[in-house]
Regions:
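Conserved short strand/loop->alpha-helix "switch" segment adjacent to the catalytic nucleotide/phosphoryl-transfer site
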Residues: 23-45, 100-102
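HAMP-domain connector/hinge
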Residues: 6-12
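Conserved polar catalytic motif of the HATPase_c/GHKL fold
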Residues: 46, 50
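Conserved beta-strand-loop-beta-strand hairpin that lines the nucleotide-binding pocket
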Residues: 1-6, 52-164
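A conserved hydrophobic position in a structured secondary element of the catalytic/binding core
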Residues: 11, 32, 135
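Short, structured helix-loop boundary elements
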Residues: 13-16, 37, 41, 108
Length: 164
């Protein structure tokens, strides 16, 4: 089974910790391993901070966060209404190395280091940046012996059955 949620947030700094807290709460309720939850929440914070800083658009002063948990996979997408990425500004693998004196790009660099797969693109025809990242989930152990979690496939299924 799976679950997903979508938020439309005002493009203000206070929205970043709100999105992060909602993701952490959803991950905790689903039984996702705390280290994985933290990594995803940090990546989400960086993507939201980028949307707040760069996502000013003529059509909307909001941005959208969508999170999908499906089996062992989590996909998070942050989309804004700003000008989008400059053509040619991002190579296919984003920033394999970040120069020490770089004044921007750290957010995408962090997202890439925390997630399994990252995709950045512009919305077709309307402008706006879209950052999507995926991560394989691990689960908190549920039978009380305190052992760390494996993947849902290793434990015989998804703990999201009750959540979805």
């Amino acid at each position: 089974m799976s679950m997903w949620w979508c938020l439309q947030l005002r493009r203000e700094p206070a929205s970043v910790p709100l999105a992060r807290r909602l993701l952490l709460d959803a991950m905790g309720s689903a039984g996702v391993d705390t280290e994985i939850s933290y990594e995803l929440s940090l990546a989400l914070s960086e993507a939201c901070a980028n949307a707040v800083e760069h996502g000013r658009g003529e059509r909307s002063d909001a941005y959208c966060v969508t999170a999908y948990l499906d089996g062992d996979q989590c996909r998070i997408e942050v989309a804004d209404s700003g000008p989008g990425f400059r053509t040619g500004a991002l190579p296919p693998n984003l920033h394999p190395t970040l120069p020490v004196d770089a004044e921007s790009g750290r957010g995408l660099f962090l997202i890439e280091s925390l997630a399994d797969h990252v995709r950045v693109r512009n919305k077709p025809g309307h402008g706006g940046a879209v950052v999507t990242f995926d991560k394989t989930l691990k689960w908190q152990h549920r039978d009380g012996d305190g052992a760390g979690g494996g993947s849902a496939a290793q434990s015989g299924g998804s703990p999201l059955l009750a959540a979805g």
